[in-house]
């Protein structure tokens, strides 16, 4: 049979270039075997040790390495029989020259081609056609590798992946041998079909060759015989389903089956390769039997195959179960755990998942125990704090990490989170109460409950505030804490701020009261009505206004009552100067006592307003002095006109500085200036006072925007009226300069300080 195959190989590889490619690929297969020798022990050391005893795995690996070099030649011959195509036949003849002289004739034709291929490697790199064949082969290799690497990502395939990855090296090289030959067969589709047809009898024919090689190897090592014996069954099984596949795929899959013969020596799991090709688990059982029991002789292989299905049966449920249930969630979960929580614990969990199925079993047991723990935790959590966990999956994510390292951190976070939940209740209380509540809330719950409740807070807070899915839960808790603190600070600021607007409200009230007192001093009957209004206002403001304001308002009432006495004395007769002087003396100390009281309050609010009020006080005192001097020298009508004109000038100055006082005083000016020309002054003044009071009440309650609008309208009217009266006021002032100067000079240094 070998002669027929050699003839077929000669017929296919008549072109020297193609034969050279086959030789190169065959040589590369040997190099890949060397790579497998180096790589296999490391992979097997990681994957096989947890399943098998460390000593057994080491012994098997040593035997595999020793046997592999010996099996390289036999495997190449077996591959040529299994693939039954030119590239493998060339490799077979190349080594057949060394081992068997039967194919010397074919070898003579091929050896010079092999030499040429070795020499022409640099030339082939430059040639495009040859690269096209290689690109096809390498492209298929790349396609095969990523699929298995993806399987390697899952922990179950991680154990099998090393075998597949290494097997790919050799089978890929074999595929490279077979695929260029397929390209040559592509010239005529019939030889490809014949290859498929022959591959089946070739697999049957391999049995004597493999058995012969096995008998030779039994002398050297028993493990090799085991490989050779089960291998033909795998080849037969592989050959049966393959005819349905395409001819090109037949070569690749058969090369993979032969590769399983190579790999089983190194790794106990070449099975997935055959399984990935779509073959049943029976092949895997035979391969696993030969690999798992490398020490047993060939005769025991059949019963061993019966025993090994139990091992394989133990493994596949892990593959199905872990891939189906446990492994896919932990991988995304593990990545999230690395981000949101401690990376060390998560990396350990990931390592336990990936290296081997035995570790996966441990992980599954841990996950089960952990899953039972979060259930108990959830019960304790709901009992302790009444929170409802929206996603129990988040607890599973947190559990593996929540072992020892996170517990202290959780205790710290709990101290923060629990008071935050309690803050809305404590907002009415002082900050000291909050600290007490913090200290009290921690000892109430036991340490175990605190740890559990911490996880609850993190999960619950994240779920309530961020409606995102459970995976990002570990990320959000720290920002949720920060936001909670910010909210608590905002609440505290809100508690503080309502006091500030009260102070602001109080200060304009004080200014309004001062303005009311000034107007009351100027007008005769404003004092009594204004006092009644202020009493009503004070009663309304007792809650919000501090006591100092009440004192200032009371002193203002005294001021307002005294000017009423002044006006009452001056109105009937201009004679009582002696009465006015002590009254004025009383006014000044009253003003001294009254105005300094609001001064400490004013600087807290607005210094400008304080300065304006002081200037107003000085001017009011000037007005009172001028009124007294005018009463002594002129009639009451002229006194009122002078006072009104003085007010016009003063109010014009005040309008620039203070808008609220100007509104009140300008309303007084308009009414007073209009009625100053009338003969019946006091009768009109009674009406004026009532109008003034009504005007005062309105602007006090009006908003700033309305006040500004009224100021603009009133100031325009005042300017026209005041300009006409300024001249008369100047004349009256010149006549009364002496008395007015004396009184104002005495009062200014006292009051304006």
Swiss-Prot record:
Myristoylated; myristoylation promotes accumulation at the cell periphery. Phosphorylated; phosphorylation prevents binding to F-actin and Cam. Keywords: Cell membrane, Cytoplasm, Cytoskeleton, Lipoprotein, Membrane, Myristate, Phosphoprotein. Residues 345-725 are annotated as: Interaction with PKA-R2. Residues 119-148 are annotated as: F-actin binding. It is found in: Cytoplasm, Cytosol; Cell membrane; Cytoplasm, Cytoskeleton. Induction: By ethanol. Changing residue 132 to D: Overexpression in perineurial glia, leads to decreased ethanol sensitivity upon initial exposure and has no effect on ethanol tolerance following repeated exposure in contrast to overexpression of the wild-type form, possibly by delocalizing the protein from the membrane. Disruption phenotype: Viable. Results in extra notal macrochaetae often accompanied by a socket cell. In the eye, results in decreased N/Notch protein levels and ommatidia defects. In all imaginal disks at early larval stages, results in supernumerary scutellar bristles and loss or mispositioned microchaetae. In the wings, results in a blistered phenotype. Females have egg chambers with multinucleate cells with ring canal remnants. This is A-kinase anchor protein 200. It comes from Drosophila melanogaster (Fruit fly). The lineage of its organism: Eukaryota, Metazoa, Ecdysozoa, Arthropoda, Hexapoda. The gene is Akap200.
């Amino acid at each position: 049979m070998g002669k027929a195959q050699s003839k077929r190989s000669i017929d296919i590889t008549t072109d020297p270039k193609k034969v050279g490619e086959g030789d190169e690929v065959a040589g590369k297969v040997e190099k890949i075997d060397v790579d497998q020798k180096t790589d296999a022990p490391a992979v097997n050391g990681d994957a096989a040790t947890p399943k098998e005893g460390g000593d057994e795995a080491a012994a098997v690996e040593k035997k595999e390495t020793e046997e592999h070099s010996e099996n390289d030649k036999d495997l190449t011959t077996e591959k040529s029989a299994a693939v039954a195509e030119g590239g493998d036949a060339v490799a077979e003849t190349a080594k057949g020259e060394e081992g068997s002289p039967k194919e010397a004739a074919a070898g003579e034709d091929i050896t010079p081609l092999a030499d040429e291929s070795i020499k022409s490697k640099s030339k082939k790199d430059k040639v495009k056609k040859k690269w096209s064949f290689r690109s096809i082969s390498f492209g298929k290799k790349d396609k095969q590798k990523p699929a298995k690497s993806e399987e390697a990502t899952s922990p179950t395939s991680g154990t099998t992946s090393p075998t597949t990855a290494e097997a790919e090296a050799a089978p890929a090289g074999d595929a490279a041998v077979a695929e260029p030959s397929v390209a040559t067969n592509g010239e005529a589709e019939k030889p490809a079909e014949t290859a498929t047809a022959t591959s089946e009898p070739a697999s049957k024919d391999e049995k004597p060759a493999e058995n012969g090689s096995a008998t030779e190897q039994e002398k050297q090592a028993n493990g090799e015989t085991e490989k050779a014996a089960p291998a033909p069954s795998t080849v037969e099984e592989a050959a049966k389903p393959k005819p349905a596949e395409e001819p090109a795929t037949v070569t690749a899959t058969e090369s993979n089956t032969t590769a399983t013969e190579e790999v089983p020596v190194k790794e106990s799991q070449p099975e997935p390769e055959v399984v990935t090709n779509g073959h049943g688990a029976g092949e895997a059982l035979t391969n696993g039997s030969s690999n798992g029991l490398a020490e047993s002789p060939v005769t025991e292989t059949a019963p061993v195959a019966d025993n090994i299905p139990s091992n394989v049966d133990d493994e596949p449920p892990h593959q199905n179960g872990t891939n189906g249930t446990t492994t896919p969630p932990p991988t995304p979960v593990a990545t999230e755990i690395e981000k949101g929580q401690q990376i060390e614990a998560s990396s350990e969990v990931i390592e336990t998942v990936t290296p081997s199925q035995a570790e996966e079993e441990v992980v599954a047991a841990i996950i089960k125990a952990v899953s039972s723990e979060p259930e108990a935790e959830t019960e304790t959590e709901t009992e302790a704090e009444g929170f409802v966990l929206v996603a129990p999956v988040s607890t599973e994510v947190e559990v593996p990490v929540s072992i020892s390292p996170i517990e202290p951190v959780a205790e710290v976070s709990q101290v923060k989170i629990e008071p935050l939940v309690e803050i809305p209740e404590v907002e009415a209380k002082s900050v000291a109460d909050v600290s007490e509540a913090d200290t009290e809330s921690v000892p109430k719950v036991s340490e175990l409950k605190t740890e559990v409740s911490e996880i609850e807070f993190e999960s619950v807070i994240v779920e309530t505030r961020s409606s995102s899915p459970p995976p990002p839960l570990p990320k959000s808790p720290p920002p949720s804490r920060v936001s909670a603190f910010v909210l608590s600070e905002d609440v505290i600021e809100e508690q503080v701020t309502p006091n500030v607007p009260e102070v602001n409200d109080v200060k304009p009230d004080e200014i309004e009261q001062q303005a009311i007192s000034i107007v009351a001093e100027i007008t005769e009957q404003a004092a009594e009505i204004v006092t009644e209004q202020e009493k009503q206002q004070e009663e309304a403001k007792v809650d919000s206004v501090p006591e100092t304001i009440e004192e200032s308002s009371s002193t203002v009432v005294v001021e307002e009552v005294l000017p009423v006495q002044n006006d009452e004395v001056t109105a009937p007769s201009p004679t009582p100067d002696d009465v006015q002087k002590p009254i004025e003396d009383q006014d000044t100390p009253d003003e001294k006592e009254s105005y300094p009281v609001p001064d400490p309050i004013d600087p807290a609010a607005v210094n400008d307003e304080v300065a304006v009020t002081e200037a107003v006080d000085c001017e009011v005192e000037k007005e009172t002095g001028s009124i007294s001097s005018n009463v002594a020298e002129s009639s009451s009508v002229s006194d009122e006109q002078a006072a009104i004109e003085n007010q016009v000038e003063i109010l014009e100055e005040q309008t620039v500085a203070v808008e609220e006082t100007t509104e009140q005083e300008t309303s007084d000016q308009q009414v007073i200036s209009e009625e100053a020309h009338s003969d019946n002054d006091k009768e009109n003044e009674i009406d004026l006072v009532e109008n003034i009071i009504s005007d005062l009440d309105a602007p006090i309650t009006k908003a700033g925007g309305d006040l500004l609008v009224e100021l603009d309208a009133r100031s325009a009217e005042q300017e026209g009226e005041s300009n006409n009266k300024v001249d008369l006021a100047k004349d009256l002032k010149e006549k009364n300069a002496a008395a007015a100067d004396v009184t104002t000079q005495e009062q200014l240094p006292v009051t304006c300080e």
